[in-house]
Design a protein with these regions (language model features):
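Conserved HGGG/HGGXW glycine-rich cap/lid loop of the alpha/beta-hydrolase fold
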Residues: 1-36
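Active-site loop/oxyanion-hole signature of alpha/beta-hydrolase fold enzymes
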Residues: 28-69, 85
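Residue in the alpha/beta-hydrolase core beta-strand immediately N-terminal to the catalytic nucleophile
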Residues: 66-67, 91-93
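Gly/Ala-rich beta-loop-alpha elbow adjacent to hydrolase catalytic centers
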Residues: 70-74, 78
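Short helix immediately C-terminal to the catalytic nucleophile in hydrolase catalytic domains
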Residues: 78-82, 94
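Flexible "cap/lid" loop of the alpha/beta hydrolase fold
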Residues: 93-122
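Conserved serine/cysteine hydrolase catalytic core
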Residues: 139-208, 213-216
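Catalytic histidine-centered segment of alpha/beta-hydrolase-like enzymes
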Residues: 217-228
Length: 242
């Protein structure tokens, strides 16, 4: 599950899922406005986001329970999935994920500033600067596709609507509390995220009694530590099936 503005999840996460796919069936979700999915103007409330993903998986013949692995902002969607469809979630693996705790200091003004920056970047075509992409593990054609999708998807209306809805979505999740399940949390060094991000993940891991693994690297942990993550995920899942 990709975070806000990841222009091509199928390519961004490839460096990790090609390793995991040797042992597991892995599905990369590309939400509306992401990757090769359609771009459309729709209300991005968290219940709609989650239900669309659930229906898409079911149409593919994929049924839970799933092990959800959200990156960044999609942590809110994963937590809502656990609330709405608890039988669908076997476990949670957080990839520098957000929780309601992360947004505790966010204000409407902060969200508005983010949206203004997105609109500014769109107007002046600054996607190459504000949406850096990783070419790790990609073929020549995939690198071209990744750049094409960045140009197509960066700061589109779906991303803007998600940002507009984030505080309301957080409030919905927060109001219903955290559902307990087996959890593994990967945490970055926090240098590319808000100052309190790391502490929030520590607190969240404590609430879920989750194993917390910290890496001295940037927010897109899978770009830097895919080998280490893969080993830890295999150990974690092995314990689930014992």
């Amino acid at each position: 599950m990709s975070g806000s503005g990841t222009v091509a999840p199928v390519y961004d996460f490839k460096v990790l899922y090609v390793k995991l796919s040797k042992d597991f069936r892995v599905i990369v979700i590309e939400k509306l406005g992401y990757g090769y999915s359609d771009i459309c103007d729709f209300v991005s409330d968290v219940d709609t986001l989650v239900s669309i993903q659930k229906r898409a998986l079911e149409k593919l013949g994929e049924n839970g329970p799933y092990i959800l692995m959200p990156h960044s902002m999609s942590g809110i969607e994963a937590l809502r999935w656990m609330q709405l469809y608890p039988d669908d979630v076997k476990a949670l693996i957080g990839n520098d994920m957000t929780t309601p705790l992360t947004y505790s200091i966010w204000t409407k003004e902060k969200v508005e500033k983010k949206i203004k920056l997105m609109n500014f970047a769109t107007k002046y075509k600054l996607y190459w600067l504000l949406c850096p992409i990783s070419n790790r593990c990609l073929t020549g054609e995939e690198k071209k596709q990744h750049k094409m999708l960045r140009k197509r998807n960066a700061f589109n209306i779906c991303h803007i609507n998600e940002s507009k809805a984030i505080l309301d979505n957080v409030a919905i999740v927060e109001s219903q509390g955290y559902k307990k399940c087996p959890a593994l949390i990967f945490k970055s060094n926090g240098k590319q995220t808000a100052g309190h991000w790391s502490e929030c993940q520590k607190e969240f891991a404590s609430i879920l009694n989750a194993k917390l693994i910290s890496y001295d690297c940037g927010h897109y942990i899978h770009h830097y530590k895919s080998n280490e993550m893969c080993k830890e995920i295999i150990k974690f899942v092995d314990l689930l099936i014992i």
